[in-house]
């Protein structure tokens, strides 16, 4: 069995690393700051990817793929964009290696590129250069496209899934004839992310817009969803950007409208990444290891055959195989435990560590009584149930687990969110871990001072701010148009 999991209240950071390791999700790679996603982690990402991909297609989007390498000059054409990403960019300067006099491999001086290439940190620049060729008329609009890719943003303090130099993600890039259409698209895709987080990840999120200092480089407005982790910190789980005409102007992307007038195109971009796996872990997992919502778990059910001699093996395995067929006929993802050399307790613990939502165990006594032992991962509850009607019972139980995980996370968020009126109360909430709704005077100076003194940042400005009362900034006493959400964050 894998190593023990450090309790959350003892060392939350180590607990997270233990859950990732014991859950067989990922490990650090020889390339500093990068991760190796293991089969269990990749299967989880594939389930997330496939569901999101279908949701994108249901809203009219198609997939394409752009190169990993971006000409350096493209990054320079949108000033805010290059400033925001410059410190994170990996740069390709040579096309081959050679051996020096001592036999060591070095970049071949003769292979220096005439132009450097940026390893993709995000694709707005190369995509909008291409869109300027694809778009000529209003008849070419809208363009609703997405790509699944890897990106590189050089990270000095890596943490598996949460911050790595290379990660997997999707990035949508759309082009529109009007500002209204583009804003509606950005809001629509934020709603898609919200639905995915709530209904599939069982992770409650809050919607809003970012402050100017937190806005995506080159965007007019950035919309976001924020989730609360078990330590009370926030995780930015997805962003959708209204880019205005900034990239269209930078890359001279215009179209002829219905009145035969030339206009710049309006744009959006939006994305989520393997960072969502980190959010999933920190929302649901416990001191026994990984906990996964059934809708996304690589295997929703594991069947554990229990027998103690050759005479018992045949009947037990036949029953387990029939059970597997019945469950799979109901669309349930099932794994058969074939590890017959370890003890039942070891095998049970291994599946707990990997987060399988439901465990079914069948032994000789269960055959006699036509029963199955069923154990839930989320509550650790066990019960003996009849094999008759087992597929329907398992399906209902998986639905209940999905709902229960969301309810538990929703309750945690509510219990650790406070409305605060003064700075002392604010510091207390932030200090113990939680979300704080507080008044802010709208200045970047106050925002920066609060972050410096408490490490808390403004996670979002709510869309429904008109429902929030006006007041005074908790720190400066200056007028505030409404409350914003503060928290420490990953």
UniProtKB/Swiss-Prot annotation:
Protein name: Proline--tRNA ligase
Gene3D superfamilies in the record: Anticodon-binding domain, Bira Bifunctional Protein, Domain 2, C-terminal domain of ProRS
Organism of derivation: Salinibacter ruber (strain DSM 13855 / M31)
SMART domains xrefs: ProRS-C_1
The reaction(s) this protein catalyses: tRNA(Pro) + L-proline + ATP = L-prolyl-tRNA(Pro) + AMP + diphosphate
Compartment list: Cytoplasm
Upper classification of the organism: Bacteria, Pseudomonadati, Rhodothermota, Rhodothermia, Rhodothermales
Any matching Pfam family: ProRS-C_1
Domain remarks: Consists of three domains: the N-terminal catalytic domain, the anticodon-binding domain and the C-terminal extension.
Assembly behavior: Homodimer.
Highest rank taxon of the organism: Bacteria
């Amino acid at each position: 069995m894998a190593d023990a999991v450090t309790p959350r209240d003892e060392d939350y950071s180590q607990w997270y690393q233990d859950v990732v390791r014991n859950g067989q999700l990922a490990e650090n790679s020889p390339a500093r700051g990068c991760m190796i996603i293991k089969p269990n982690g990749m299967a989880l990402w594939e389930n997330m990817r496939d569901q999101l991909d279908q949701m994108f297609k249901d809203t009219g989007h198609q997939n394409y793929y752009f190169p990993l390498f971006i000409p350096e000059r493209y990054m320079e054409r949108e000033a805010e964009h290059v400033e925001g990403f410059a410190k994170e960019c990996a740069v390709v300067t040579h096309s081959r290696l050679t051996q020096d006099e001592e036999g060591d491999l070095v970049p071949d001086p003769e292979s220096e590129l005439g132009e450097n290439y940026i390893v993709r940190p995000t694709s707005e620049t190369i995509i909008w250069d291409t869109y300027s060729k694809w778009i000529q008329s209003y008849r070419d609009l809208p363009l609703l496209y997405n790509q699944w890719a890897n990106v590189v943003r050089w990270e000095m303090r890596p943490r598996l899934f949460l911050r790595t130099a290379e990660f997997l993600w999707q990035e949508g890039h759309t082009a529109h004839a009007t500002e209204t259409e583009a804003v509606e698209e950005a809001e629509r895709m934020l709603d898609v992310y919200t639905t995915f987080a709530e209904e599939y990840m069982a992770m409650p999120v809050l919607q809003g817009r970012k402050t100017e200092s937190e806005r995506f480089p080159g965007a007019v407005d950035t919309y976001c969803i924020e989730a609360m982790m078990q330590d009370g910190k926030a995780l930015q789980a997805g962003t959708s950007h209204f880019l205005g005409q900034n990239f269209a102007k930078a890359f001279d992307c215009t179209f002829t409208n219905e009145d035969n007038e030339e206009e710049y195109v309006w744009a959006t971009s939006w994305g989520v990444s393997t960072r969502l796996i980190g959010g999933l872990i920190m929302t649901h997992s416990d001191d026994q290891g990984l906990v996964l919502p059934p809708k996304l778990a690589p295997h929703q059910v594991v069947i554990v055959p229990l027998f103690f001699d050759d005479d018992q093996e045949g009947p037990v395995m036949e029953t387990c195989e029939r059970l597997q067929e019945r469950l799979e006929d109901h669309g349930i993802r099932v794994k058969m435990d074939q590890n017959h050399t370890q003890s039942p307790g070891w095998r049970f613990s291994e599946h707990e560590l990997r987060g399988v939502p439901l465990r079914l165990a069948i032994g000789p006594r269960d055959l006699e009584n036509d029963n199955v032992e069923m154990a839930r991962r989320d509550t650790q509850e066990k019960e003996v149930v009849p094999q008759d009607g087992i597929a329907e019972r398992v399906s209902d139980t998986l639905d209940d687990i999905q709902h229960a995980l969301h309810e538990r996370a929703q309750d945690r968020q509510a219990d650790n969110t406070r409305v605060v009126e003064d700075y002392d109360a604010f510091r207390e909430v932030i200090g113990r871990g939680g979300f704080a709704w507080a008044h802010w005077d709208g200045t970047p100076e106050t925002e920066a001072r609060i972050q410096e003194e408490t490490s808390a940042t403004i996670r979002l400005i709510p869309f429904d701010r008109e429902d929030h009362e006006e007041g005074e900034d908790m720190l400066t006493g200056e007028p505030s148009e409404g409350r914003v959400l503060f928290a420490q964050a990953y």
